[in-house]
């Protein structure tokens, strides 16, 4: 195990063993708002907050937007969950990820407030404290589970709230274990003072979203304003004015390409020009999202004519997306699969 991985595990262990911080899921905004109040409201210093909410596609949408905004010579801070390799990945600060030292320092500041928080709330405050110091142009914030009382639902006037695919993930956190309740928790508590973007949804989900947003005063942009199209073996983003080729060797499935298109729609509305977007698309990669691993110890254990594909799908929707991609491969496929008991 690498030294960096050990540092990450040690930090997670410190969080888990701290008596002030709870490992359990407990949705309540009072605790985190009290901490932020005691810290003089650092969340109010964050510019152009983009909340990314939903069940599947938050990471790929956030990552695509981050690439487009930074290609436009602007800086982003980004908060993701969960991390893949180490805790630092959760906290992007514009030029680099937070260091272990900066994370530890932030934990001590939070601990001094003597307020019981969940571990996810602590991680959210760590991001806010450090992003507030950076004054970056945009702050991209991925929601945790649901949104109504999620610790990222803190901003009255976000620049954008983007809703990716909503499905039956996180039913275990709800008293009413229905898709309707998931939709309500994710879109029923959005800001009335923002621009709401809705990603591709099943017709029933889209109908319910329409119903919930009837009384919302924000500008709402539905997914019928753009689409993913295929022509002569190539994929394109298309809206009424523009057509952009999706020139990528890293993004493979229809679901992920739709998330890329969703990001293109938002980027265009942020006045990022078409040429910048076209130049940036070939560079975008999504870790552990139908990703072909190119290096590492495992690659040395396969034959030269074999490929190693990694995907972290953990819902029915993302599993179907992976399965549909695998059906396009005209080669023998061998799989190693694991899943937690609660799925």
Question: How would you name each of these model-derived features?
Answer:
Residues 1-54, 67-72, 79, 115:
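Short functional linear segments
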Residues 65, 127, 207-210:
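Aromatic/hydrophobic pocket-lining residues that form π-stacking "cages" and hydrophobic walls in ligand
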Residues 47, 134-142, 158-279:
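Acidic, Mg2+-coordinating active-site environments of NTP-dependent enzymes
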Residues 48-49, 73-75, 307, 332:
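Residues that mark the start of a beta-strand
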Residues 65-70, 131, 213, 326:
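Hydrophobic alpha-helical packing residues
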Residues 138, 149-162, 167-171, 181, ...:
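Nucleotide phosphate-binding/pyrophosphate-handling subdomain across enzymes
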Residues 60-64:
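Hydrophobic positions on the alpha1 helix immediately C-terminal to the Walker A/P-loop
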Residues 29, 36-37, 42-47, 71-156, ...:
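ATP-dependent carboxylate-amine ligase catalytic core
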């Amino acid at each position: 195990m690498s030294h960096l991985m050990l540092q990450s595990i040690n930090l997670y262990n410190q969080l888990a063993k701290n008596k002030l911080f709870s490992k359990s899921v407990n949705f309540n905004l009072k605790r985190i708002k009290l901490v932020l109040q005691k810290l003089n409201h650092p969340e109010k210093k964050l510019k152009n907050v983009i909340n990314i909410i939903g069940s599947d596609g938050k990471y790929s949408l956030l990552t695509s937007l981050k690439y487009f905004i930074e290609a436009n010579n602007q800086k982003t801070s980004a908060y993701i969950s969960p991390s893949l390799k180490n805790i630092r990945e959760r906290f992007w600060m514009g030029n680099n990820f937070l260091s272990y030292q900066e994370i530890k320092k932030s934990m001590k500041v939070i601990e001094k407030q003597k307020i019981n928080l969940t571990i996810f709330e602590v991680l959210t405050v760590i991001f806010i404290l450090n992003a507030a110091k950076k004054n970056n142009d945009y702050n991209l914030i991925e929601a945790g589970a649901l949104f109504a009382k999620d610790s990222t639902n803190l901003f009255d006037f976000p620049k954008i709230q983007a809703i990716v695919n909503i499905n039956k993930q996180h039913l275990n956190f709800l008293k009413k274990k229905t898709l309707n309740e998931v939709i309500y928790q994710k879109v029923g508590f959005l800001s009335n003072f923002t621009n709401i973007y809705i990603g591709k949804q099943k017709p029933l989900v889209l109908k319910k979203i329409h119903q919930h947003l009837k009384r919302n005063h924000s500008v709402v942009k539905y997914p019928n304003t753009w689409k993913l199209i295929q022509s002569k073996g190539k994929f394109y983003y298309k809206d009424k004015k523009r057509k952009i080729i999706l020139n990528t060797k890293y993004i493979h499935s229809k679901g992920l390409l739709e998330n890329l298109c969703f990001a293109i729609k938002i980027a265009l509305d942020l006045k990022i020009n078409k040429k910048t977007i076209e130049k940036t698309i070939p560079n975008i990669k999504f870790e552990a999202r139908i990703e072909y691993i190119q290096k590492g110890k495992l690659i040395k254990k396969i034959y030269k004519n074999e490929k190693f594909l990694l995907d972290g799908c953990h819902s029915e929707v993302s599993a179907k997306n992976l399965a549909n991609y695998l059906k396009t491969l005209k080669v023998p496929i061998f799989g190693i699969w694991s899943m937690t008991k609660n799925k």
